[in-house]
Curated annotation (Swiss-Prot):
Mg(2+) 1 binds at residues 134, 139. One of its GO terms (biological process) is terpenoid biosynthetic process. Its cofactor is Mg(2+). Residues 1-21 are annotated as: Disordered. It comes from Fusarium proliferatum (strain ET1). One of its GO terms (molecular function) is terpene synthase activity. This is (1R,4R,5S)-(-)-guaia-6,10(14)-diene synthase. Belongs to the terpene synthase family. The Asp-Asp-Xaa-Xaa-Asp (DDXXD) motif is important for the catalytic activity, presumably through binding to Mg(2+). Catalyzes the conversion of (2E,6E)-farnesyl diphosphate (FPP) to yield the bicyclic sesquiterpene guaia-6,10(14)-diene via a 1,10-cyclization, which requires the abstraction of the pyrophosphate from FPP to yield the (E,E)-germacradienyl cation. The only accepted substrate is farnesyl diphosphate (FPP). It catalyses: (2E,6E)-farnesyl diphosphate = (1R,4R,5S)-(-)-guaia-6,10(14)-diene + diphosphate. Substrate binds at residues 242, 295, 375-376. Binds 3 Mg(2+) ions per subunit.
Length: 401
């Protein structure tokens, strides 16, 4: 596997059990927190005269200009996945309704339009886990608790390595239980339990490696919060941190599993193959930072490239334009890396082509999901309006922030 040294091995592996992630605590934080299920109130800003109109770059250019395909198992898998996660975390009716609208299964469906129902369900459940897990570090109780963050990651790593106790559906640690079921499933074939060939040890090592990159990014993010350095970093330092904490690396490898892609070591270890993963992670996070800009302002989220560039003296429109340039540069970096890749041979190249398709679908699915589900807008209709007009309306009193 491609590896990098974060310089924080001791921090990532040690720590006493500082936090009990109980169902009651999860439910309480979902009701009061600022995560993906929290819907900011837009209704008080209906007058266009009170808005600053920001023009977005064309986010559907280059690799994103292709039509998306939806997995045929989407409808049936969505119903089961939504019901299951709500049951596991003992969610109330309001949260369950919001979760249906967030629609993690749609996201998984665009990521892997040809995978089995079992693989699609696993991908949808991974999305549910990732957002619940991430919210703890992003705006939740671990966002400024470095020791607590390191400890929670250590407990989750034990699950991945098979050294943790078995959790149950009625466990006091529902997020850990969900992750344990995912580890169980990913060790199997994407066709289902005891169906087809189980995942190789080589693939599972890659799956663990991708999650380690994610967790190292989360620790770096929390450390930045604790040190109060959100707006003192340069764009490159921000990208280096966010491309890990975004969670795109494990999501991408999870989609490799959904398609039965097991990259040979000579492919997986090639620097340009990893560079393509980095590039697409950058594209996803930069697009996300534009579309989430208003929501991040409302919720006080500092981890946003537009906000970072504004802190450096740019106007909001100038900052958005600059992020648009960065996104287009991602495509140039992608094609440059692609042109320099060697040929590995028929079987390895077939796996590589599958990997490249997964990367493209991941970026496209993330983009479409943000518009379709109204994730960052007051409704799906508002998301459709933003996509059509490329106009993002920000209350003037907020635009000055």
């Amino acid at each position: 596997m491609v590896k990098f040294d974060s310089g924080s091995e001791s921090e990532m592996t040690n720590g006493d059990d500082l936090h009990i992630n109980s169902k009651h605590e999860v439910k309480s934080r979902m009701a009061n927190g600022n995560g993906v299920h929290n819907v900011p109130d837009h209704d008080q800003f209906q007058d266009r005269a009170e808005m600053e109109v920001l023009i977005l770059p064309d986010l559907f250019s280059s690799l994103m200009s292709v039509p998306a395909r939806e997995n045929p198992h989407y409808a049936s898998v969505k119903a089961d996945a939504d019901e299951w996660i709500s049951s596991v975390i003992n969610a109330d009716a309001k949260w369950a309704s919001r979760n249906k609208r967030v629609d993690f299964t749609y996201l998984a469906s665009i990521w892997a339009p040809d995978c089995s129902a079992f693989a699609l369900r696993t991908s949808a459940d991974w999305n549910s886990w990732a957002f619940l897990f991430d919210d703890q570090f992003d705006e939740g109780h671990l966002s400024n608790d470095l020791d607590g963050a390191i400890n929670e990651i250590a407990r989750t790593r034990e699950i991945m390595e098979g050294t943790a106790p078995r959790y149950t559906a009625d466990s006091e640690h529902p997020i850990r239980y969900v992750f344990q079921t995912l580890c169980d499933r990913v060790k199997q074939s994407p066709e289902g339990f005891y169906a087809g060939k189980p995942s190789s040890e080589r693939f599972y090592r890659r799956w663990m490696w991708a999650h380690e990159l994610y967790w190292e990014g989360l620790v770096a993010q929390v450390r930045t919060n604790v040190e109060g350095r959100s707006f003192t970093r340069g764009p490159e330092e921000y990208l280096a941190m966010r491309r890990g904490s975004l969670g795109a690396y494990p999501a991408l490898v999870n989609n490799e599993w959904a398609y039965g892609i097991d990259l040979p070591e000579e492919v997986a270890d090639h620097p340009l193959v990893f560079e393509i993963m980095v590039i697409m992670s950058d594209q996803i996070l930069l697009v996300n930072d534009i579309l989430s800009y208003e929501k991040d302002l409302r919720l006080g989220v500092d981890h946003n490239m537009v906000r970072l560039l504004k802190a450096k003296g740019l106007s909001t429109q100038q900052a958005i334009n600059e992020v648009g340039v960065m996104i287009n540069n991602c495509y140039r970096r992608y094609y440059r890396a692609l042109s320099e890749l060697p040929c590995f041979g028929e079987e390895a190249d077939r796996a590589l082509l599958g990997y490249l398709e997964v990367e493209k679908n991941h970026a496209l699915g993330s983009l479409l999901w943000s518009y379709k589900t109204g994730r960052y807008f007051k409704s799906k209709e508002d998301g459709a309006r933003v996509r059509k007009t490329r106009e993002l309306l920000i209350p003037k009193k907020m635009a000055a922030l």
